[in-house]
Amino acid sequence: MPWRTALKVALAAGEAVTKALTRAVRDEIRQTQQAAARHAAATGQSPSETKENANANAKLGISLEESLQILNVKTPLNREDVEKHYEHLFAINDKAKGGTFYLQSKVYRAKERIDEELSRLEQKSEENKEQQKENSKE
């Protein structure tokens, strides 16, 4: 008899935990979707652009915002400015001049992330030009 009662209590506790966990996961998914929608609205990006940025951030391990801060460049990205800032920061953080490999790698990763963004923007502008040509032909 005591085993039966203990089994009922254990089953009830397991059921309650399962329901609570299911509810928590469902709430977390809903909140994540809402946060993604708010982020897209705040940045003015489409969901696909947001996903592309997230993929690039994950692939390179650094966000675009952090990269811009490290290299001290502003958002109308200019390849020449990025290259100039990169070369300067990479040179002054040389180990022979008292810098560290860690700082050099941060500068390198920042430039790599900005280059990825510039490539993506160039590809997007080329696609827009092609689309405009097709629309003008019709």
Curated annotation (Swiss-Prot):
Region (J-like) location: 66-119
Main location: mitochondrion
GO annotations of cellular component type: TIM23 mitochondrial import inner membrane translocase complex
Protein's name according to its UniProt entry: Mitochondrial import inner membrane translocase subunit tim-16
Low complexity compositional bias, start-end: 32-43
Species this protein is from: Caenorhabditis briggsae
Lineage: Eukaryota, Metazoa, Ecdysozoa, Nematoda, Chromadorea
Ranges annotated as biased composition (Polar residues): 44-56
Leader peptide range in chain numbering: none
